[in-house]
Design a protein with these regions (language model features):
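C-terminal helix-cap and adjacent tail motif
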Residues: 97, 193-208
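Short helix/loop capping segments that flank catalytic or ligand/cofactor-binding pockets
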Residues: 29, 79, 132-133, 207-208
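Solvent-exposed coil/turn segments that connect beta secondary-structure elements
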Residues: 73-75, 127, 203
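Short proline/glycine-enriched turn/loop segments at secondary-structure junctions
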Residues: 183-190
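Short, surface-exposed helix-loop/turn micro-motifs enriched in polar/charged residues
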Residues: 60, 169-172, 190
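N-terminal amphipathic, basic helical "cap/leader" segment at the start of enzyme domains
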Residues: 1-118
Length: 208
């Protein structure tokens, strides 16, 4: 489609513009560890609370169905394992110790070769069945739709944080649901489905 009224040229003279211009998807990482402070900030950016008691991401009727799980690999000051992030308290509660990155990689369709080498990953999950019943005044599909929208909002927050900090990430949503159910059992909350994986680490080379 062509034609129409021309808009003013974008000047790209503010901080958000520069962050958006540097946003990339990264699938190759170095083995450099991340700091616990970096991980804390990443988790807050994805799912944290603000000083007004709200969250950093919007949620339909403030239901906040998305759970955030950290899979820690090479993080200075934090043992390998899976940790559930509690945003109100800004704390981590371990769900399984040891290196869980290979198990998470099994859930992906095309990241099994490189995901186990990422220093960390954030898992986004939700009880989708419960979400379908959460809005009785609307069709059940709306509850599930809201969940997916909120996954996108959380992922975009992660992208913006990563772009500002020079950290690499990518949203992995191409998942094998059956394998994910088995490999992530005990890592994410009971009855939750894995909806997205956000690897985190130092980019090894230019991303797209």
């Amino acid at each position: 489609m062509t034609g129409g009224d021309a808009l003013p040229a974008i000047q790209h003279d503010d901080r958000l513009d520069h962050i958006l211009l540097s946003r990339r998807s990264t699938k190759q990482f170095t083995d450099s560890p991340l700091s616990l402070a970096e991980i804390a900030h990443a988790l807050w950016t994805v799912a944290g609370t603000t000083t007004a008691g709200h969250r950093v991401g919007a949620s339909a009727r403030a239901t906040y169905p998305i759970a955030t799980t950290l899979v820690a690999g090479e993080i200075d000051g934090l043992a390998m394992g899976a940790y559930l992030y509690h945003p109100v308290e800004h704390t981590l509660v371990i769900t399984r110790s040891g290196d869980q990155r290979p198990a998470v990689a099994e859930a992906s369709l095309d990241a099994a070769s490189w995901l186990p080498g990422c220093p960390a990953a954030i898992l986004l999950s939700a009880d989708v069945a419960a979400a379908r019943e959460r809005f009785p005044d609307q069709p059940a599909v709306h509850g599930e739709r809201f969940v997916w929208i909120e996954v996108g909002l959380a992922a975009q927050n992660a992208y913006l944080w990563a772009a500002e900090r020079g950290v690499g990430t990518v949203l992995l949503a191409g998942l094998d649901d059956e394998r994910a159910t088995g490999s992530c059992r005990g890592l994410i909350p009971h009855r939750h489905e894995l909806l997205g994986i956000l690897p985190l680490g130092e980019p090894a080379q230019s991303a797209s």
